[in-house]
Amino acid sequence: MRIVIKNGIVIDGFGGEEKADILINYGIIKGIDKNIDVSDAIVIDAEGKYVLPGFVDMHTHLRQPGFEEKETIRTGTESAAAGGFTTVACMPNTNPPIDSEVVVEYVKAVAQREGVVKVLPIGAMTKGMKGEEITEMAKLKKAGVVALSDDGFPIMSAGIMKRVMTYGKMYDLLMITHCEDKTLSGEGVMNSGIIATMLGLKGIPREAEEVMLARNIILAKATGAKLHIAHVSTKGSVELIRRAKEEGVSITAEVTPHHLTRTDEAVYNYDTNTKVFPPLRTREDVEALIEGLKDGTIDAIATDHAPHTKDDKKVPYDMAPFGISGLETAFSVINTFLIQTGIITMKALVNYMSMNPARILGISNGIRVGATADIVIVNPHEEYTVDKEKFKSKGKNTPYHGMKLKGVVEYTIVEGQIRYQKNKKFEKVEI
């Protein structure tokens, strides 16, 4: 399949930004120039639109195997394509967890057969994600995991976590940590503060995140492991990460679109779609997260896409599961609240959502001749109203339902194949 993308504003991920055409032939970018004309090619007119390296999500929950009522690899990757993501890294909190090479191979096989975008498995740090016995990391790496994490089941034992990092360093595996001291978070369901008190809901204090983050930084410094901090949510965490980077610790961090744009005030109406972990914090925290993103303390924007069924969320707030379905609104949310307001540029977004996540995960990305054609075309000016019922994901749990957002994904191209086109039903063609 040959594709020519014409007249778009190309941000290549390497510092370049220009109006140009792109020629794609059999999955590879063959030309970037003015006025490319070839016969027998699909022509995409990108006039007035941005042509960007495909987004890479470091933190996606695809739920398969074990929780297919919430999401499958098929529906999750369809959702990813609709959001402009060409690659997603899937968390190991499945049933069974991704803690053995057998489960890794299963995920890869299903992704190859049914996936719409590229899927990178993340392996568990401990068997069953129980925080007791470390997994066989050499076998997991050989099977194809790109990182290790126990996701929402943080390892409470510092001794075991140090062993995990020591072996992770040995096998050159990225350590992705969900920083939570469960003795501090307890049964909390939202940010600890005046709003939680007013609503009669149990709070989760900042210290629950910051204490565990501080411990993990100390262990990473001691072992030399590559540490990545998932879904940073507090001002104190930003300060800890900034200091760690200044001290030379091998540390990177991510923040979600919802933590960058929403506060605990969103919980006022007890909408369970605002229940997420870590919880939505205060305006002061949001401002610190944005500043951390801008100054390089935080490296990436990741969705923490956590789909749930409608019945899961149709319960009292304190009984509902944590999680937001975030793949399909990520670009629009960042574009609306950060780009259109002048806080960051589209070129910066490419770093946060395309290039830095790829670099951290150890994969290639970017638009240049000879590169794999993983590309997203976006219209930053088109406004739409979020309708959760139109999501490709099984998870309709979004706090943005009914909200007007600016910025839509027009096309998602994965290895030279059109995997998503706005307003067109998708039919998978083998890559």
UniProtKB/Swiss-Prot annotation:
PROSITE patterns: DIHYDROOROTASE_2. Zn(2+) 2 binds at D151, H178, H231. Substrate binds at H61, L62, R63, N93, H308, F322, G323. This is Dihydroorotase. The active site is at D304. Its cofactor is Zn(2+). The keyword Metal-binding applies. The lineage of its organism: Bacteria, Bacillati, Bacillota, Clostridia, Thermoanaerobacterales.
